[in-house]
Amino acid sequence: MDSIVDDAIDEAEDMGDGSAEVGGPTDINRSGTMTDDELQAVLKDLQTNITVVGCGGAGGNTVNRMHEEGIKGAKLVAANTDVQHLVEIGADTKILMGEQKTQGRGAGSLPQVGEEAALESQEEIYDAIEGSDMVFVTAGLGGGTGTGSAPVVAKAARESGALTIAIVTTPFTAEGEVRRTNAEAGLERLRDVSDTVIVVPNDRLLDAVGKLPVRQAFKVSDEVLMRSVKGITELITKPGLVNLDFADVKTVMERGGVAMIGLGESDSESKAQESVKSALRSPLLDVDISGANSALVNVTGGSDMSIEEAEGVVEEIYDRIDPDARIIWGTSVDDELEGMMRTMIVVTGVESPQIYGRNGEVQAQAEGRLEDIDYVE
């Protein structure tokens, strides 16, 4: 967690795919064997298409950080009503939502305006996510564009057949009651139209990082969102000691309901055990994981990481979670983490005082209904 804070602070201080065609059966040798080139073509055709859509300012910042960091195997889309912010974002595709509604001047902190802007730009949204197997929708809840547009984007993604995972922050208490109420309404809507919603409570983030200037606090929030999306994505797209595929992630995330995430790291001699303990103690993971119905675990380390160390992380989680829970885990290698290990845990089907609103069991009953929860003006 410390490096996340350090990275975010450094960032704040510094400031102030085409697919190959695959032939039919005639391309395969008569013997039934295939050349390496033919196998590579099949592999390319079968790769998971992942799209990350950043909605509003916070979502755009997440996409921008992923663009800077470099993410393997995902298309980055930034969608905003504020043209000034949008032009500064690094992304593969940019959508200026609701140009007629807002003239590119933002949503004025009104979620209704953000929703109407997204509905005006639905065709562009569908085009951006077309062909995706998995869509991440990331936003900061409480404001206008992110809160209003994220449910519209998630609904479009799910209707297109993609596994839809929303990763959102909830407001700092200091942002006021109106933003909190709007965040609650936005989260309710997202729960209705997403497979899984991962919630990052900004107030709990402050508990982890202590007192920081406002700008740096938001940078830390952006960094956590980026690490969360990147961690899940690269479980699928990057080779590792233990690889996961799209079907594995779908097993945990499809109809996962509300989830929370824990991030931990260690460079000690017992780095495997310490990184998982740090993740489990993370203020972001403000739940008793013993009641979770499933967990997704990503262990990242340098080239010196052994399979025994990675297995040690998972064994630690098995000891703490419901024995009937499903655990999917994988590892990825990052050469920059020599001598260090990072653990990311996503637990689904959880309840926490940090999660607003009703129990996720009624999600299916409200499927597709966006208009029955009011935002505050």
Curated annotation (Swiss-Prot):
Keywords linked to the UniProt accession: Cell cycle, Cell division, Cytoplasm, GTP-binding, Nucleotide-binding, Septation
Protein name per Swiss-Prot or TrEMBL: Cell division protein FtsZ
List of residues binding GTP: G57, A58, G59, G60, N61, G144, T145, G146, E175, R179, D222
Residue spans of biased composition, Acidic residues class: 1-16
Family statement drawn from the similarity comment of this UniProt entry: Belongs to the FtsZ family.
SMART domains on file: Tubulin, Tubulin_C
Superkingdom of origin: Archaea
Record text on subunit structure and interactions: Homodimer. Polymerizes to form a dynamic ring structure in a strictly GTP-dependent manner. Interacts directly with several other division proteins.
Compartmental location: Cytoplasm
An example Gene Ontology biological process: FtsZ-dependent cytokinesis
Segments of this protein annotated with the region Disordered: 1-33
Family matches, as HAMAP family: FtsZ
Organism of provenance: Haloferax mediterranei (strain ATCC 33500 / DSM 1411 / JCM 8866 / NBRC 14739 / NCIMB 2177 / R-4) (Halobacterium mediterranei)
Disulfide bonds: none
InterPro entries according to UniProt: Cell_div_FtsZ, Cell_div_FtsZ_CS, EF_Hand_1_Ca_BS, FtsZ/CetZ, FtsZ_C, Tub_FtsZ_C, Tubulin/FtsZ_2-layer-sand-dom, Tubulin/FtsZ_GTPase_sf
Record keyword Acyltransferase present: no
